[in-house]
Amino acid sequence: MILSIMQPYLFPYIGYWQLIANSDKFIFFDVVQYNKKSWMNRNKILHPDKSKEFQYISFPVKNNLQGTLISAVTLNNEEKWKEKILGQLTVYKSLKAPYYNETIDLIQNIFIQDYQTLLSFSIESTKKICQYLDIELKYEIASEIDFDRKIIEGPGDWALSISKEFNTSEYINLYGGYKIFDETKY
């Protein structure tokens, strides 16, 4: 079995989808600390002012205190973040971006549901985008897996422990992550 593991992201980059497409099982990695400056609840899009390179889209979170696990991060639904994101994305309509209407339809389909947590949004949006892209998604959530946390001494050990739990024959990761892994342990 080929396994891959990633933290949840807001509309992730292409490498995320490549991992899912090339895995037999994908793990939503939610058992580490949330980082408010990460891509978990924000992303970059083009800015309507051509003199500016980009703008952020994001959804607000309620509890982003230092030490909060990703699995515990809740969304602040009192703010109208869905409407704001859809409004920000109109920059692509003005640029006559191909597939704009299809993409907005997909995002609106994702936004129909109410989400209480960052993780629930990430899972549901990933499922719907995979369906749109015709990518099979078989997933687990790290916080729901009974894997050996005692062997974890560094960042690369999480994947090793989860891989052992599933008797994985191969673990794949994006290129940028190779620095945290000790090949001799795999």
Range-by-range predicted roles:
Residues 1-186:
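Residues lining hydrophobic/aromatic ligand-binding pockets adjacent to catalytic sites
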